[in-house]
Amino acid sequence: MKKMQQLALPYLIWSILMLLLPMLLIVFYSVITSGNTIIPFRLTLEHYVRFFTDPDFLLILWRSLSIALETTIICLLLGYPIAYYIARCDEKRQNLLILLITLPMWINMLVRTNAWIGILSNDGVLVQFLGLIGFHDVQILYTRTAVLIGMVYNFLPFMILQIHTSLSKMDNSLIEAAADLGANRAQTFWRVTFPLSMPGVVSGIALVFLPSVSSFFIPKLLGGGQFFLIGNVIENQFITVGEWNFGSAISVIIALIMMLLMMLVRKAEKKSAVQEDRS
């Protein structure tokens, strides 16, 4: 036991230096402002008050939450059928399909998002195709639609993999038992398959929604600076404006929102696990 504690000590020190201290520093910056010659700073909540009393920042926060929700819903609607199909395939085909889904993830996300600029531009493949079928002068790049496409493209694999993991662990004898009891395919899916896959669905929702809320380079590249999300505001406060205190306050607010969402996800996972055990 003592040896294990000694082996864990370097990881504990690393976690404190790389995770805990930066978070504490951000919290500290969020509650201070410039002082006088005697006391260089003073405690204040003015940065939080500024955020919650400025309608522009609240609008951007709402926009970030809404587009993250849209991304999550689309990823779920697309990801579940794909994961279900993969789980129904034989092992060799499953491995091939999982490889094809994860293959783009081996490339840096920034590079993948940049590639969509060429696809969605006015001279790109998608706009040219839309022109051929009668939709002329369509502007996709630097719009909300472009940002949504980029979000779905980058985060869809996380949804698929989580749901596939739950479906692949499912006991197929339960489906056979449902069929023996007279349930048709639709009834079997909604009463057996879907409830048992809920842990994967909940995990997938978390892995898509949380990074979507705080994403900054996807809206920056595909939104062209015309579609700001809360991640862009934080980046702007730290790098461009130089208001580290206000940027830290926004970061803390987003972190608290994410912690709340994670608590809800954990609660949903426990509820799903209880239902699965009862099944």
Predicted features and spans:
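N-terminal signal-anchor/first transmembrane alpha helix
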Residues: 1-26, 95, 255
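Interhelical loop and adjacent transmembrane-helix boundary motif
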Residues: 1-3, 48-56, 212, 216, ...
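C-terminal transmembrane helix and the adjacent membrane-cytosol boundary/short C-terminal tail
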Residues: 6-8, 164-179, 248-279
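Transmembrane alpha-helices
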Residues: 9-21, 99, 103, 153, ...
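Short membrane-interfacial helix/loop motifs at transmembrane-helix boundaries
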Residues: 20-55, 123, 224, 279
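Non-cytoplasmic
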Residues: 22-29, 34-35, 111, 159-160, ...
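Membrane-interfacial helix termini and adjacent extracytoplasmic/periplasmic loops
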Residues: 36, 45, 113-152, 186, ...
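Transmembrane alpha-helix signature in integral membrane proteins
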Residues: 55-88
